[in-house]
Each structure stands twice: as structure tokens, then as C-alpha cells.
Amino acid sequence: MSNRRQTRAQAQQFIDTLTPLQHPNSEKVYLTGSREDLRVGMRQILQSDTLVGGTEADPILESNPPLKVYDCAGPYSDPDAEINVRAGLNKFRQSWIEERADTEQLAGVSSGFTQQRLADDGLDHLRFDSLLPPRRAQSGKRVTQLHYARNGIITPEMEYIAIRENMEQAGITDPVLRQKAKGESFGASIEQVITPEFVRQEVARGRAIIPLNINHPEAEPMIIGRNFLVKVNANIGNSAVTSSIEEEVEKLVWSTRWGADTVMDLSTGRYIHETREWIIRNSPVPIGTVPIYQALEKVNGVAEDLSWEVFRDTLVEQAEQGVDYFTIHAGVLLRYVPMTAKRVTGIVSRGGSIMAKWCLSHHSENFLYEHFTEICELCAAYDVSLSLGDGMRPGSIADANDEAQFSELETLGELVKIAWEYDVQTIIEGPGHIPMNLIKENMDKQLALCDEAPFYTLGPQTTDIAPGYDHFTSGIGAAMIAWYGCAMLCYVTPKEHLGLPNKEDVKQGLIAYKIAAHAGDVAKGHPTAQIRDNALSKARFEFRWEDQYNLGLDPETARAYHDESLPQESAKVAHFCSMCGPKFCSMKISQEVRDYAASQEVELQSHASYQAKSASEIETGMAQMSAEFKAKGAELYHETAVVDEELADAEA
């Protein structure tokens, strides 16, 4: 069997046998909101107890609280969920949408292209069968979360998000877990507790979006904004060269397991429409697309043949399928194209290059820009959010922060204000390849030019020297820009610039970017971000190996690395690892020093008191303590009875 067929067969088997996947020692828990059908899922990591004293036969233990963490996997991490990829996920938001009474179910699909696909019997074997007719806004209505927020309405989606962002971590009172360094948020308004009203205010202001198409009721509400947890997007999708529907559905499920907050389907190969249907119906996270890719397929890959009519029909097609956000390259203007002529890498955005070619071939202004108000009207009818694409982003650090890039950014700032006039939720896409010293300028300009609309960046990649490791080179920039205020990071996999990522590449990219996003949250001073770090550090110091693995982003890899060199059962409770061994473990030595100091009643004196002593007094005291230590066998541990006897003698 060829590698391609084998990969597809494995993906098919994955789908056929798909059951909920849980991380070790974790359980799915739900917090209920103000109504019974508002149940917010999250992962709860159970911890073992800490040994604080006693004997081997009669130990004294201190419990460690379970830790709730953000979970993107929806039903795929719930052992009680019944998973049937052919039926799709539960449409749990359907009742919320219907009770607002501002949408209507259509008799059939509106897109001419979709009608053609449905009439083609040759596609029956590829179809997702369990389809409902699409919904759209009633005439004269706007059904976006931005519209509701501006009218003072707190939707169930907003309450859901508030519960999800807090993760009930305010209930953790352990001072060791609650401690955190003072953050630097660069002007962000980060609340100690996220309330539904705060969510509403941020959405109404345009500083955050809730990407939830009314035709994607399976999606769990989430929010993108710099005053919330930093989110991560994963890209999947087939190409003309490789991949299949089965593989893309597998990647979707896999992406949510490893923490993708949203997923973009960037398919450019055959059966784009059918692939997307399977993905949306089985996705618990918002799905984004770049509609120009499919529009180009419809004109056989000839950019010059694109038209507004073809593109508009594509928007309707995808909106009625349930796409939650569109990347639209409406800022690539004709007059900006010559600015890229002297670049090292020219225009590297696929969407940007397509529109640049169309503009030059017709010597006309970008039709996405010319028809932008119509795009907004369409999005407002389905609550499709806009992601204004950066078609002029730099493809090398040599081209960073140039005239073309920032000219487009100015235009995106103009477009976001137009979108807001139509109550369309909008985010701004950013670079790209940017050296570390130029990253903050990007964030500052975006906030100023785009009136604090959420920023969504691809990296940025900080150096161009490491093909095969661009999840590292870009993860560095991603962590920095997340700290400066970027709301969502688009992951980069090890295959960036080299090929279409497989499952393992998707995982590696997501882990790298979850690290970057979390590091940004910690640096900003997010009130609960450091709790997980502290819990893991405490487990590490106490040699609770299993807890150390399970509290991490990738328990399986951590456990495998440890057991690779110390596979014995005894090593799972040992107070050392193979890095330093039993005699040189800094944490073991530190614990022994603590125990010794406590057993000897060593008095910890202030620095000022220490300085007040003469050099000779200090030297004499140190020599005395050294002699006593050696006289007792130079052992850090002593039997309790011996210590008690010595203390009694000292008191006498």
C-alpha cells in the first residue's frame, strides 16, 4: 500500500473508531450557568497528596486541590459523550438562536454553487448526510453578537464565555498557587474576575469578538480580545497535492485535543465544499476560511477570471454552511502593489498575491475593497466575523515594517470602522516575519490605527535561518506579541515553508503556540494564568512525578522522556531524575537543607543583622557550625530521636 493510501486508511480508521480522548488523571467537568442548558465544559486535573511528615507506615499527607484548565475539545474529551462523525456534534446552541426570534430557516440553500453540488449524484459518496436547511437573519434584522452587545443584551454566549475564562480558579486559595509576579499589560484592561457584563462591554467596544455563525450551533462560545486569555488558531485543509476528507476531520479532532481555540480550513484541493461540511458539523470550535481560495478554484485557478459575483456566491455558500469567520484581503489596494517591487520576498500571502494579480491584470481597484459594504451586510445576516487579511505582510525579516505593510494596515483601520457600522465583529491580521526589535512597533501601530480591534498574527517569525524549526523561530515572536497585546496567534508547524503538516506537525505547532500564548498571559499579569505554573512547580519540588507530567501541556511526552532513562518503577517516586542523579539534584539538596535547618533550629537572621557582625565573628560562627556538621557524620538527615536528644541537652 502506498504511503498516501496508508495515511488515508489510518485516518478512516481513526474516524470509525473515534471515542473521547482524555489526558491522564483528568476528568471532564461542567459548570452550570443561570440556565440549565448553559453548561460550560472544562478539564479538571487531579493531583496526588503531598507528604509533609510522619513515617512510612503512618505518613502525614496534605491534599493538593484539583486544577481546572481551559478545554477546547468539546465532546471529544468527555467520556460520556457519544461520538458519531457521520451525524455530527450536538447542536446545543440551536435553542439560544431560535429563542431570539430574529432569524428564519430557509427552504433551501441560496448559493448557486451549492445547488449545483447538491444536484450532482456523483458526489453522493462524499456528502455529509445529516444536514439542516440554513438560517439567516429576518429581513431588516442584524443577528451579530456585536449588535446584541451594543443594545445592552447579555446573551447566553456571553455568560458562557465569562464562566469559561474564569475556570472557577477564584476558588483556589492556596497562597503558594495564588502568588504571581506583577505583570506589564501595556494598557490592557485585565479584570480580576470576568463577568458577563464585562464580556458584553468588550464586544460592544469592538475590542473583542465572539465568532459564532448562527449556522454553526455545535460550536462552543469563545472570545478573542486582548483583555482575555490569548487564543491560538490551527490551520488545516487539503491541497491539490495531498490529503483527504478523512485526514482533515482527523486533524480537526486532533487540533482541539491539543488546544486549538479556532481552526481555519485552508483547503485548496478537490472537494473543498464537502470537506468543509464535514469539518464544521464536527467542530466544537469556530471555523475560519479564506473564501478567495475556493473562489479561485471555481475559475480554474486563473486569478484574472475572478469576479465579485463568483466571490459573493462563495461567501453565501460558506456562510450558510456555518463558517464563523472569513479572512478577506480587502486592504490590498492597486496603489500598494508597486511598493513590494524591491522586497526580498515580494508578496507571500496567497490571498494577497491573488488580489494583487487581479488588480494588475484589470488595472482596477480590488473588488473586495470596492464591495466591502456588501460583504458587511452579508456577514451581519449570519453573524460571520471578519478577519481583515494582511496581504502585504512581510515574508522575510528583510521586508519587515516596510511601506507596503503599514500602508495596508492603515486601510484595514479604515475598513474595521466600516464593518462596525454594520455591527460586524472584526479582527485584524498581522505578520509575518519580524525581527524581535520591530515587533512592538507592529502592535503599537495596530492598536492606534485599528482602534484596538483584536490583533491576530502569524507568529511573527523572528529569524529566517531555520526551515524545519519555524515553530520555534515564530514561537519566540508569538510570545512577545502576545505579551504586547495580540489577541490570537496563528500557529506555525515544523512544516512551514516546506509542506502540508501531518498530525504530529499539528501537535508540535500547537504545543509551541500554547506555550507562547500562556507566556503572554503570565507576562501581562492575567490574574489566574500563573496558577498552573505554580502547581507544576510545587509538584516538581515535591517529586510528585505523575502530577508534574499531568499538569503539563503534553503529559505523554514528559512521561516518555523521564522513563526513557529511568524506566524502573522505583524511579516514579525517586527524588531525582537522570539529569543530575541522586547526589546532585538541586531540589533534593534544597529540601535537605530546609530539613536540616528546621531540625537544628537554625535562626534565619536579617541581612542587616548579618552585616552588623564583624568578619571575625562570622568566620568563627561558620567554623563552629562546620565542625558540628562534620562531627555528626556530615549527614543531612538525622534520626528524630537523636535530634530530640540533642535539643533537650541544649535546653538543659
Swiss-Prot record:
Zn(2+) binds at H433, H497. Belongs to the ThiC family. Catalyzes the synthesis of the hydroxymethylpyrimidine phosphate (HMP-P) moiety of thiamine from aminoimidazole ribotide (AIR) in a radical S-adenosyl-L-methionine (SAM)-dependent reaction. Pfam families: ThiC-associated, ThiC_Rad_SAM. It catalyses: 5-amino-1-(5-phospho-beta-D-ribosyl)imidazole + S-adenosyl-L-methionine = 4-amino-2-methyl-5-(phosphooxymethyl)pyrimidine + CO + 5'-deoxyadenosine + formate + L-methionine + 3 H(+). It comes from Shewanella woodyi (strain ATCC 51908 / MS32). Its EC number is 4.1.99.17. GO terms for cellular component: cytosol. [4Fe-4S] cluster binds at C577, C580, C585. Binds 1 [4Fe-4S] cluster per subunit. The cluster is coordinated with 3 cysteines and an exchangeable S-adenosyl-L-methionine. This is Phosphomethylpyrimidine synthase. Homodimer.
